[in-house]
Amino acid sequence: MSNKAWGGRFEVQPEEWVDDFNASITFDQTLIDQDIEGSIAHATMLANQGIISQQDSEQIIQGLKSIQHDYHQDQIQFSASLEDIHLNIEHELIKRIGDAGGKLHTGRSRNDQVATDMHLYTKKQVQDIIALIKSLQSVIVDIASNNVDTIMPGYTHLQRAQPISFAHHIMTYFWMLQRDQQRFEDSLKRIDINPLGAAALSGTTYPIDRHETTALLNFGSLYENSLDAVSDRDYIIETLHNISLTMVHLSRFAEEIIFWSTDEAKFITLSDAFSTGSSIMPQKKNPDMAELIRGKVGRTTGHLMSMLMTLKGLPLAYNKDMQEDKEGLFDAVHTIKGSLRIFEGMIQTMTINKERLNQTVKEDFSNATELADYLVTKNIPFRTAHEIVGKIVLECIQQGHYLLDVPLSTYQQHHSSIDADIYDYLQPENCLKRRQSYGSTGQSSVKQQLDVAKQLLSQ
């Protein structure tokens, strides 16, 4: 007798190397807890519907729980010849409890079984990711709250542009992560759907109760179409997209961390605990954790592209191609969870060099817009003011000084309306104070922003 669940149809058994190519047990055993959870719900429902006896159901459930326990105690070795987690568990169950174990698969296919596992797994992982995002956001808010008055240069095109609050800058990433969190939250509506009972593709002739398994597995709803239930992998693509976009945001943040920690910037100092050294250059302290996070975006985005291409042109119901949905998702989940934890620890332990930041904005032309705005208050059209300030900046560059160093007489040569109050006007801290529009970098506006963020975190 063949050891294959489908062996009755075949005269020749696959060779071992073919089994190895076909098998997924090396990675889909990740789903063991979800597979057993789904099977317990299925066995419970079968008994309640009178499809199998209560005694058989109880034997099955106890057998499944013993397999789960022994697996986590490293007491079970699964076989590639049994292909996947589903058939390995069924084989072990029959070995332990006898013929009753063979009744578990009544009214069920591996098609709806694996779909159920993947929905349960993805739901749990997305909930974990949301919690990790919120935890990172909380650290960002703490850092921002302590740096409302810390001034730094804001950049466009990686050129110094205008002075901004460090709190305002870092809170940008709070809002990126907030959108990420919202996307994950919204996706749960499309993940939290029960496919169990769809069987291979057309449902089953047994009098099953899909609403019961939906309740037992804490799903929010169930698929209305059995063929859609076993064909759908949209939720995996959506999860991979949300992971990839969150990783892109972490990568952008990581790039700033890397730049800020350079000797050229010296805006922050990373903790030794989140840095590494060089095997040849003893002075080096490298921001490897930030660089790794930046690099891992290619990995998660690659998994997204791979899954999109796997589904492209795929016929309905289950096709073996769908086995390829797992490794990419598992790896992407592992990657983002690790990246979020690392990022939280990295920024929580970094030192913000406030004096360096505050001094930096006094050694550039990031207050040039303020000079133009000052001229506008003297009833000079902004475009004319822009031209005047551009000429003043050019002279400063040629003479090697900054706007706060320009003598009043020189200013007045460019326009007679410039008074001695210009020096106070151009101070970086005053540049921030004047920016009070909603969502701007002024202190009162940033504090308002922080209040909104804290309220969101408390929900």
Curated annotation (Swiss-Prot):
Its EC number is 4.3.2.1. GO terms for cellular component: cytosol. CDD domains: Argininosuccinate_lyase. GO terms for molecular function: argininosuccinate lyase activity. It is found in: Cytoplasm. It is an enzyme of class 4 (lyase). Belongs to the lyase 1 family. Argininosuccinate lyase subfamily. This is Argininosuccinate lyase. It catalyses: 2-(N(omega)-L-arginino)succinate = fumarate + L-arginine. One of its GO terms (biological process) is L-arginine biosynthetic process. Pfam families: ASL_C2, Lyase_1. Keywords: Amino-acid biosynthesis, Arginine biosynthesis, Cytoplasm, Lyase. Pathway: Amino-acid biosynthesis; L-arginine biosynthesis; L-arginine from L-ornithine and carbamoyl phosphate: step 3/3. Gene3D superfamilies: Fumarase/aspartase (C-terminal domain), Fumarase/aspartase (Central domain), Fumarase/aspartase (N-terminal domain). It comes from Staphylococcus aureus (strain MRSA252). The gene is argH.
